[in-house]
């Protein structure tokens, strides 16, 4: 009778109450049970109060209760009927696989981003190449145009250069006239000497006088040559002279302050060019790397045009010379 009463009493008790009573008989606290079972104290308390946490699956809850029963020496067979009522098996809700789909979406997004990046890069490279080609083509067309203009100007100069010998002959006649008139004062000396020595006919005296006047003229003519040569070399000493040396073939155009073209055409390799005009000078150089320029005794820096390989357009201003 006592055994049946005890069995009925145990069945009347819930699972949580039986576990709590067994724990108290062993003198264990909830903290000690939680530490031995590696559970939270709140979980042990919920089990003793017959509470099923909503965030805890029934399978885990049944496992915790069985571990608790073994710890406090309560037979598991006696707790099975109560477990079925307290924690019935519920179908676990299987969450859809998020990680794979998320990784797939992320990979797809990264693929679009990479494709867009490459597209932008190709567009930038294409625009840069098109810009460079347009500039290069424009420079080549400009150089060709300038070369054609210089060729036309050279042909025009050749056509108009046939009248040059007439000017030179006039200049030579002007140069020889002073030379012939210069020794005229020497004739009275010669004529007086002739009259003192012998008496000659008037016709012979005129012949001698003409001969003596021609001789000093012949001797005086060479003395006029150095002065004309000095006059030709004088412009080279101009402080505003522009001196250019060419290391390769180069097209060039030089204009002074008055708008006069001092030079426009092609210069060959190892050529030299000295120009004098009114400063400032405006220069247009087709190949800056092929020319070395000196202005007022100082070299002109063309490195910025050489680096970019462009047609050089620059203006050379005159610097004031120090007072002596």
Curated annotation (Swiss-Prot):
PROSITE patterns membership: HTH_CROC1
Spans annotated as Disordered: 155-191, 211-231
Composition-biased stretches (Low complexity): 167-188
Pfam families according to UniProt: HTH_25 (PF13413), RodZ_C (PF13464)
Localization in the cell: Cell inner membrane
Residues exposed to the Cytoplasmic side: 1-111
Membrane protein topology class: Single-pass type II membrane protein
Domain of life, per lineage: Bacteria
Transmembrane segments: 112-132
Chief place where the protein resides: membrane
Any one GO BP annotation for this protein: regulation of cell shape
GO CC list: plasma membrane
GO molecular function, one term: DNA binding
Gene3D superfamilies in the record: lambda repressor-like DNA-binding domains
Domain HTH cro/C1-type: 19-71
Keyword Cell inner membrane in record: yes
InterPro entries: Bact_Cytoskel_RodZ (IPR050400), Cro/C1-type_HTH (IPR001387), Lambda_DNA-bd_dom_sf (IPR010982), RodZ (IPR023690), RodZ-like_C (IPR025194)
Record's keyword annotation contains Membrane: yes
HAMAP family: RodZ
Function: Cytoskeletal protein that is involved in cell-shape control through regulation of the length of the long axis.
Domain free text: The helix-turn-helix (HTH) motif in the cytoplasmic domain of the N-terminus is involved in the formation of spirals to maintain the rigid rod shape. As this protein is anchored in the cytoplasmic membrane, the HTH motif may contribute to protein-protein interactions to form the RodZ helix, which is localized beneath the cytoplasmic membrane. The C-terminal domain may be critical for determination of the rod shape by probably interacting with enzymes required for synthesis of the peptidoglycan layer, including PBPs in the periplasm.
Protein name: Cytoskeleton protein RodZ
Species the sequence originates in: Salmonella typhi
Taxonomic path: Bacteria, Pseudomonadati, Pseudomonadota, Gammaproteobacteria, Enterobacterales
């Amino acid at each position: 009778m006592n055994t049946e009463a005890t069995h009925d009493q145990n069945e009347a008790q819930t699972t949580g109450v039986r576990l709590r009573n067994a724990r108290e008989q062993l003198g264990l606290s909830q903290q000690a049970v939680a530490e031995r079972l590696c559970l939270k104290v709140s979980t042990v308390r919920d089990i003793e109060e017959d509470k099923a946490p909503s965030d805890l699956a029934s399978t885990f809850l049944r496992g915790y209760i069985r571990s608790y029963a073994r710890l406090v020496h309560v037979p598991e067979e006696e707790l099975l009927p109560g477990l079925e009522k307290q924690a019935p098996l519920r179908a676990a809700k299987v969450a859809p696989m998020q990680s794979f789909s998320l990784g797939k979406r992320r990979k797809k997004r990264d693929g679009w981003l990479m494709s867009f990046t490459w597209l932008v890069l190709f567009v930038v490279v294409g625009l840069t190449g098109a810009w460079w080609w347009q500039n290069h083509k424009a420079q080549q067309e400009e150089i060709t145009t300038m070369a054609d203009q210089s060729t036309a100007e050279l042909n025009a100069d050749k056509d108009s250069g046939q009248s040059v010998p007439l000017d030179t002959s006039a200049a030579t006649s002007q140069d020889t006239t002073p030379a012939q008139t210069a020794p005229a004062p020497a004739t009275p000396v010669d004529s007086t000497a002739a009259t003192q020595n012998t008496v000659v006919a008037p016709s012979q005296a005129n012949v001698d006088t003409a001969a003596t006047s021609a001789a000093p003229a012949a001797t005086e003519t060479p003395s006029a040559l150095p002065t004309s040569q000095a006059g030709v070399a004088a412009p080279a000493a101009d402080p505003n002279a522009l001196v250019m040396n060419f290391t390769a073939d180069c097209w060039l155009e030089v204009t002074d302050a008055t708008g006069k073209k001092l030079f426009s055409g092609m210069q060959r390799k190892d050529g030299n060019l000295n120009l004098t005009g009114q400063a400032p000078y405006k220069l247009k150089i087709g190949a800056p790397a092929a020319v070395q320029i000196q202005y007022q005794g100082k070299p002109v820096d063309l490195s910025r045009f050489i680096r970019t390989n462009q047609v050089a357009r620059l203006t050379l201003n005159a610097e004031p010379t120090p007072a002596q």
